[in-house]
């Protein structure tokens, strides 16, 4: 079984938000909500400052606190790709997973269940990339199997310095940012 992950090249991301709109459209995300978003962060120390623009989403962690705290099992790790998912009809809307997620990657859908990025597994099962990856005009996002040493994501991780968000949280995120 694959273990999906994503690599985002922060040198290429221009913050255009095509990924956000594609996700909202593909996944019928209600107006005013999003499963992914654009963040800007100033990195470094003056006078050597850089602006990092990055697309963020659920990190589909290897050690997801949102799964272990869920009282109903609605938050779970799917066998296919080891992707963190939410089963809407099992979710009671208690928000424990929202509190547990250090990345702010979840929200309560207007229908009362928690929603988040799914890595578009409905598309991936058909051999397609997630919607965000497929529309990116700068090709800054790469999706693939982290357990396949020959995958494009692994080639990128070997070729450049990368970081994850909040490594100190111990979640072992699977979204990597090339710097």
Residue ranges and their predicted role:
Residues 1-179:
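Non-ligating segments of multi-cofactor redox enzymes
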């Amino acid at each position: 079984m694959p273990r999906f992950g994503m690599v985002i090249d922060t040198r290429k991301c221009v913050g255009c938000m095509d990924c956000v709109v594609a996700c909202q459209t593909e996944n019928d995300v209600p107006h005013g909500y999003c499963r992914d978003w654009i963040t800007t962060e100033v990195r470094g120390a003056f006078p050597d400052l850089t602006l990092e623009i990055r697309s963020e989403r659920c990190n589909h962690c290897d050690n997801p606190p949102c799964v272990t705290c869920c009282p109903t099992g609605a938050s779970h790790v799917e066998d296919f790709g080891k992707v963190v998912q939410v089963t809407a009809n099992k979710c009671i809307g208690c928000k424990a997973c929202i509190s547990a997620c250090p990345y702010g990657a979840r929200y309560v859908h207007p229908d009362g269940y928690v929603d988040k990025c799914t890595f578009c597994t409905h598309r991936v099962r058909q051999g397609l990339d997630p919607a965000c990856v497929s529309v990116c005009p700068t090709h800054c996002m790469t999706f693939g199997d982290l357990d396949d040493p020959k995958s494009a994501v692994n080639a990128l991780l070997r070729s450049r310095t990368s970081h994850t968000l909040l490594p100190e949280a111990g979640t072992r995120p699977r979204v990597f940012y090339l710097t």
